[in-house]
């Protein structure tokens, strides 16, 4: 329906990707959701992205508050197959299952803008090279989007503890770790790729925004 409207009204761009996401379970085949989007403008020399990332850059993780609105098809299936109700109190979570699953998504707009404003200057490119929002696809797939050809991200899995909600889903549904990692954020909501010399400053900015942050890993040449 949305694509037909775009064609009928000669809007031009196609309606693709996340804007036409399927929601098996809560939505019937003849139902659809309407979403909004905002487009901003940035000067070319201020843009972030893979072309700025270099070997030696550091990955700084910003903690997630929960599932972050991703992976609910998997979670609903696991919960339904286990026969759990949303009102069930889960000791590992310290609250009901429903309360945990409805934890609001943490937003990173202010902390990311604070990083850029604190560490950048109009006269020189900033030391924040890229930002990766960990949404559908998990940590590996989303970080890969901000890496240029020839570079890889070396992630230290011991640098953080996966929050209990993800372990609960895995154990309840006997979900392989590979599937879990490819679907859920596992506690990492955003990754900043920055120059080594500003890591401490980035961590201070995150602390000032009351968002947990830590060094997640480093960017390396793929051949090393």
Residues of each region from the PLM?
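Acidic, glycine-rich loop-and-beta core segments that form the ion-binding/anion-interacting portion
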Residues: 55-100
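Glycine-rich anion-binding loops of enzyme active sites
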Residues: 1-73, 218
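Glycine-/charge-enriched secondary-structure boundary and capping motifs
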Residues: 1-3, 7-14, 27-32, 91-101, ...
């Amino acid at each position: 329906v949305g694509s037909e409207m775009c064609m009928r009204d000669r809007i031009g761009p196609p309606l693709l990707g996340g804007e036409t996401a399927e929601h098996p379970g809560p939505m019937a085949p003849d139902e659809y959701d309407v979403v909004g989007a905002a487009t901003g403008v940035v000067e070319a020399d201020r843009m972030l992205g893979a072309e700025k990332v270099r070997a030696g850059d550091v990955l700084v993780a910003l903690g997630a508050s929960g599932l972050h609105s991703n992976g609910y098809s998997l979670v609903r299936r696991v919960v339904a197959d286990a026969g759990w109700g949303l009102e069930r109190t889960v000791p590992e979570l310290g609250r009901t299952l429903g309360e945990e699953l409805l934890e609001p998504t943490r937003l990173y707009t202010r902390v990311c803008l604070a990083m850029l404003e604190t560490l950048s200057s109009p006269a020189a490119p900033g030391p924040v090279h890229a930002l990766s929002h960990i949404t559908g696809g998990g940590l590996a797939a989303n970080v890969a989007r901000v890496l240029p050809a020839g570079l890889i991200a070396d992630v230290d899995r011991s640098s953080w503890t996966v929050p209990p909600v993800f372990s609960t889903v895995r154990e309840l549904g006997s979900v392989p770790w590979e599937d879990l990692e490819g679907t859920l954020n596992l506690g990492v909501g955003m990754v900043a790729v920055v120059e080594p010399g500003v890591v401490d400053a980035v961590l201070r900015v995150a602390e000032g925004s009351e968002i947990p942050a830590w060094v997640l890993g480093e960017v390396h040449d793929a051949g090393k």
